[in-house]
């Protein structure tokens, strides 16, 4: 029995392109669809567009996580193995599945529906959390290479996308600890400014361009704007400033040079634009444990102070900028999430 994407029994989270109500496009990490159902049959219809790396969907079925390899390009029907439970056999149980985007815009995947057994039922889910956070970040916020747990505190191993998992990003872990929904506007390699960072080489695209978009990777076509009325977070985390040292670490070389002054001005402008969309939200500015020069954090602190907005804060982790030369692995992301969620819980937030 086909369950179409527009079914009211399904729950979604994330910035999703709903141009076609029965073909929603997942772009950002942590974007998800959830379903509760009966029976022991589960398949998912998808359409994938690949830019780079191998692409996988995350799947958590009855608390057990797996990953599903997506076709490089085109439609696919993915079968998910369901273990019948004693409760299910007795006729009063159910299964719950969460499908989610593990990776950033290295691909875009269209969700085309579920398939369950004939005569089976899709059940109501509990209400979504009333707490809502939003994250603007880079590969660390996306959970890139997070599953390479043999490389804690070390440079990355060779990889082709298989270790990237947004579930284990500090961003989603923080949302879990807070009991909050999340929109994770994160892209590997992205910096603040166009023309810097690593994303979309050699015509680098920065967060100053991508922050208000659904589609922003030119590989997939023209950019499209996000409708900010669709989601109003009470907390926004801005985690930009670690890819900005490429191709030149001008902040480290000369804190007061014209490039550095320009960066601080534009960082402040981004915060003002976010504030314009969310007048009542708390905005928490961070970098991460990934090694970087402290001058970037000094700049963020300076901007936050100059804005004189009580609800814009700069938070610094215990091992900020000195934790690891590689991407954050699961234990390091957990460390960040523990510190960040504890800090957020102490703010006077009207959830």
Which residue stretches match the model-derived regions?
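A structural motif corresponding to the C-terminal end of an alpha-helix
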Residues: 170-181, 270-282, 306-309
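Extracellular serine-dependent O-acyl
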Residues: 282-351
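Structural recognition of the beta-strand scaffold that forms the well-ordered cores
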Residues: 132-136, 141, 182-186, 234-239, ...
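N-terminal secretory targeting modules
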Residues: 1-166, 348-351
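Generic structural signal for well-ordered alpha-helices
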Residues: 267-271, 300-301
């Amino acid at each position: 029995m086909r369950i179409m994407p527009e079914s009211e029994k399904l729950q979604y989270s994330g910035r999703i392109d709903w141009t076609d109500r029965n073909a929603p496009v997942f772009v950002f990490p942590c974007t998800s669809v959830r379903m509760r159902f009966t029976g022991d049959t589960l398949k998912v219809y998808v359409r994938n567009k690949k830019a780079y790396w191998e692409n996988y969907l995350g799947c958590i079925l009855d608390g057990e996580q797996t990953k599903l390899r997506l076709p490089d390009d085109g439609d696919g029907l993915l079968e998910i193995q369901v273990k019948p439970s004693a409760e299910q056999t007795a006729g009063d149980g159910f299964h719950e599945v969460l499908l989610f985007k593990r990776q950033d815009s290295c691909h875009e995947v269209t969700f085309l529906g579920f398939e369950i057994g004939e005569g089976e039922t899709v059940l109501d889910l509990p209400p979504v959390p009333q707490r809502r956070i939003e994250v603007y970040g880079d590969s660390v916020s996306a959970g890139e290479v997070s599953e390479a747990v043999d490389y804690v505190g070390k440079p990355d191993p060779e990889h082709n996308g298989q270790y990237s998992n947004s579930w284990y990003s500090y961003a989603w872990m923080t949302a879990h600890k807070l009991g909050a929904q999340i929109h994770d506007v994160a892209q590997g390699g992205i910096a603040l400014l166009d023309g810097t960072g690593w994303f979309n080489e050699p015509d680098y695209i920065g967060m100053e361009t991508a922050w208000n978009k659904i589609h922003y990777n030119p590989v997939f076509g023209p950019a499209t704007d996000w409708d900010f009325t669709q989601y109003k977070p009470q907390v926004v985390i801005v985690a930009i400033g670690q890819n900005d040292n490429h191709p030149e670490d001008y902040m480290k070389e000369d804190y007061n040079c014209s490039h550095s002054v320009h960066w601080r001005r534009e960082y402040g402008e981004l915060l003002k634009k976010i504030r314009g969309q969310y007048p009542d939200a708390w905005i928490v500015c961070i970098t991460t444990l990934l090694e970087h020069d402290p001058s970037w954090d000094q700049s963020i602190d300076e901007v936050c102070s100059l804005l004189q907005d009580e609800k814009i804060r700069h938070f610094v982790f215990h091992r900020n900028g000195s934790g690891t030369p590689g991407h954050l692995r699961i234990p390091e992301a957990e460390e960040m999430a523990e510190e960040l969620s504890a800090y957020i819980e102490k703010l006077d937030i009207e959830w």
